[in-house]
C-alpha cells in the first residue's frame, strides 16, 4: 500500500549548500522531517551542479515522517542572468534595457529548461524564455 502523504514543501535550495538554518530547518521541522537527513540527501544529489545554483525543490512529506524530494532545473531568471553575467534585471522593464542576450543563448537555455516547461517543442520553449527575458528588461538580439 502507498504511504499517506501529509503535505508538500516547496523551497529554493542552493545546490550543494543545504543546511539546517532558515529557511530549510524551520520548514522541515514543522512537518517533523529529519532535517539533517534531507540536507545530506539533497547535497549528495546536487553534487554535480555548480555550487550555489538555486534549485526549486518539492519535498513530499509522508505520515510516518519520511520524505522524498524532487529537484527541478534552476529558474529561468537565474539562467538568463548567468548567461550574460548580470547582477539583476532592469528596474523598469520595457523602458530601461538591462542588457542584451542572443537568440542562440535563449535556445540553449530553452533546451536546458525543457523538462520543466509546459511546452511541446523547443520553439515554444524558446518563446517562453524570450518572454521572461523581455520581462526582466533584456533585449533579444539575433545571433
From Swiss-Prot:
This protein's encoding gene: rplK
Similarity comment: Belongs to the universal ribosomal protein uL11 family.
HAMAP family attached to this UniProt entry: Ribosomal_uL11
CDD domains for this protein: Ribosomal_L11
Subunit structure: Part of the ribosomal stalk of the 50S ribosomal subunit. Interacts with L10 and the large rRNA to form the base of the stalk. L10 forms an elongated spine to which L12 dimers bind in a sequential fashion forming a multimeric L10(L12)X complex.
Annotated Pfam families: Ribosomal_L11, Ribosomal_L11_N
Species of the source: Zymomonas mobilis subsp. mobilis (strain ATCC 31821 / ZM4 / CP4)
GO molecular function: large ribosomal subunit rRNA binding; structural constituent of ribosome
UniProt KW keywords: Methylation, Ribonucleoprotein, Ribosomal protein, RNA-binding, rRNA-binding
SUPFAM superfamilies xref list: Ribosomal L11/L12e N-terminal domain, Ribosomal protein L11, C-terminal domain
Classification via SMART domains: RL11
One term under GO cellular component: cytosolic large ribosomal subunit
The organism's taxonomic lineage, starting at the top: Bacteria, Pseudomonadati, Pseudomonadota, Alphaproteobacteria, Sphingomonadales
Summary of the function given for this chain in its UniProt record: Forms part of the ribosomal stalk which helps the ribosome interact with GTP-bound translation factors.
Post-translational modification remark: One or more lysine residues are methylated.
Biological process terms in GO annotation: translation
Protein name: Large ribosomal subunit protein uL11
